[in-house]
Amino acid sequence: MDVSHLLDGLNDAQRQAVASPLGAALVLAGAGSGKTRVLVHRVAWLIQVEGASPNSILAVTFTNKAAAEMRSRIETLLGVPSGAMWLGTFHGLAHRLLRIHWREAGLPQSFQILDSEDQARILRKVLKALELDETRWIPREILWFINAQKDEGLRPKHIKDDGDPTRRQLIKIYQAYEEACQRAGVVDFAELLLRAYELWRDNPPLLQHYRTRFRHVLVDEFQDTNAIQYKWLMLLTGPEGLPFVVGDDDQCLAAGTQVTMADGAKRAIESIVAGDSVLSNYGGGDFRPARVTECFTKSRQGRLVCVHLRSGAVVKSTPEHVHFAGYVLGPTPQTYFLYLMYKEGMGYRLGTSQVYTEGQARPMVGFEQRALQEHADALWIIRTHSSENESRIDEVLTSLRFGLSTCPFVPRKGKGANGFVHDASHLRRIFTPLDTLVAAERLLEEVGLDIDRPHHLPQSRNSNRRNIVITLCGNRLGGTPRGGTPMHRISVVAMSPKDRAVLEVMGLRMRAAKARGGSWRFETVRADFGELMSIARAIRERLDGRYVLKGHMLEKSLPFVTAASIRAGMVMVVDSGRFDVVERIEYESCATQVYDLNIERTHNFIAGGIVTHNSIYRWRGARVENLQQFRRDFPKAVLYKLEQN
């Protein structure tokens, strides 16, 4: 059997991971390393080469959309349906399991998942029965407490009150709420996975049945798993299982990087220890001391990214390290772009634009205006140039190399109304028969970009796009421009009554987004960024949402951007409290120690004179320990590292 098509277009590291022998495997994916392709091709490899039945494969993603896309790509690669495979989100798979085994799970056959009104009604009855005042015991805060315990896999009997009367009462409410739900034969969203875990844990024959059936368990974004998700996966695979998990690689700075301390002195990052105080940005350019809570180091062999600013400031990091960088009107010089644009239902295309354009109703960066005009879903900056002609030459050559169209997704207005690109039917005839995904992935991998991390996600009125906007240091508790506690903000706009209902089920308070119109907004702040990201993760799974991460480092916020995604002409924030322009990007290959710090509350520090983010795992509410725990649970697991081409 010829299976060369399963490895075609993959680099050596990707091929090794895809064609790895049967056994536990941990794939650490760097920026722009093509991890999604590896998962898709691995499933196809298991079926066509290893002879695995689709019925024996369970694959987990974090959104329904990602699951649907993966299924579609697997079917395209194999040329056959993949319906027998279990592919979905953690909660979606748990729900499916409970529907099949409702009796063993202690549920009625027609059990319901609580909507917002029913959940609030049950909780209010519980509070009334316990003679508790709702103004003191706020339902939505109680629900977040209950959900947090379930995410840890904890029932009321497992939780310690630590001598805290408030916590003791919350545990009592949790117990009464749980009993009320059981009597009513209903479950909330967080209950699905915990109940599915207990179903297997308490029924060894059933667990063995599924262990025998699902010999192949694949997991995407493994670094984002929480406690109950990890427990559920490990229970299913068992010590003899064959898990194939993909997670993000470490994000670190090179040895010798000079970190600005609280007193203004500079010290090499390798000399800093937990408890030291560094200078940090509390938001809006408010630089103050912040405590280092953790230090991290590891050996690194591979490429490092050197970002050079016009002022001479330089920061050297792994390609995966997160910085704050973007295009800001005013500080950003005129720059010309070659971009890759994606529109759902159409595919990918190439185009050119520039920072400053004429005739705008309101000023915005050129590629943002183009994305808005074409109702695009995502956009990546492939390369930047100093002249329009250079960007257009790049567009033509790249289009020919990768077979990507340069035609617009929507008809152009203005001159030549009868021209080719002014007719929607002509444009549909171009894009409909094309499968541009593979070409787009090849291009993005070549330039070190990740298909899951676009430079721009349009804020759209289209209800199919649900952006979860998260702003580090977006607010401050204390009410003064300088001083106070940094608060981190999350906001989500619900464009339909269905979305609104989903958010309300989670206990989120909605308000009208505008005086007129049919949209609603949820917005809140938290001092703990990990807690905020836990909320964001829950919203993402329920709404198939996507993160838009920003840091409010000066008067204008900058996106979270990996070092591999930084482009010339972007601006970053330097220690003088101003924007500075990225002049050039260089790469170097080396074997060295790399380091990172975790900064209390603010999660940023100054490295090489540039404000940068600290380790991504430590702040987003996931359990970085799960990656280390996996290595302990599967000591024979083979490690594969995917790095940028």
Task: Describe the function of each predicted region.
Residues 1-114, 208:
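P-loop NTPase Walker
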Residues 23, 52-56, 81-84, 122, ...:
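Short glycine-/polar-rich loops that comprise or flank the Walker A/P-loop
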Residues 42, 69-77, 93-100, 122-126, ...:
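Alpha-helical scaffold elements adjacent to nucleotide-binding pockets in ATP/GTP-utilizing enzyme cores
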Residues 43, 61-64, 90-91, 246-250, ...:
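A short beta-strand-to-loop transition that corresponds to the Sensor-1 phosphate-sensing loop
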